[in-house]
Design a protein with these regions (language model features):
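Chalcogenol-based redox active-site neighborhoods
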Residues: 1-161
Length: 161
């Protein structure tokens, strides 16, 4: 079942690259006591994610943070090495936390898994954005089609804060 507005995020683990290598971060580490703008993409470096979704987030990052958001987080079903390379290649190292959900544990726990096996991509995340306050979903914008950025971009979430 897909998570809904008003529900608490389940406990899960992500991997985040640090100078010491991949480190585990829990949902509590990321969301507890914080206001977080979470953006999920089906895959790092994929066309829509890289050319449309990510730019919409970074174009609005300062304005989102100016509205009281503590953290901007980007999650994808990729490993921490890929997410770190993607972060480095965007030159946005300080604007967002890139969360690796390599086994799709978080994605499955919130009912946002997408079977992209037909495209050779395996299980991925649906494309969405959400505003999370202290671990509770306050806003949720789920795309009807994974190749579109119509409601999950940074501009939409900014307008909802």
């Amino acid at each position: 079942m897909t998570i809904q507005v008003g529900e608490k995020l389940p406990q899960a683990q992500f991997r985040v690259m640090t100078e010491e290598g991949p480190q585990v971060k829990t949902t509590d580490d990321i969301f507890k006591g914080k206001k977080v703008a979470l953006f999920a993409v089906p895959g790092a470096y994929t066309g829509t994610c890289h050319k449309m979704h990510l730019p919409s987030i970074f174009l609005n990052a300062y304005a989102i943070k100016d509205k009281g958001v503590d953290t901007i987080a980007i999650v994808s079903v990729n490993d921490a090495f890929v997410m770190n390379a993607w972060k480095r290649d965007t030159d946005q190292r300080d604007e967002a936390v890139f969360l690796a959900d390599g086994n799709a544990d978080f994605t499955k726990a919130i009912g946002m898994e997408l079977d992209a096996s037909g495209h050779g991509l395996g299980i991925r995340s649906k494309r969405y954005s959400m505003l999370v306050e202290d671990g509770v979903v306050k806003k949720l914008n789920l795309e009807a089609m994974p190749g579109k950025v119509e409601v999950s971009g940074g501009d939409t979430l900014l307008g909802q804060i």
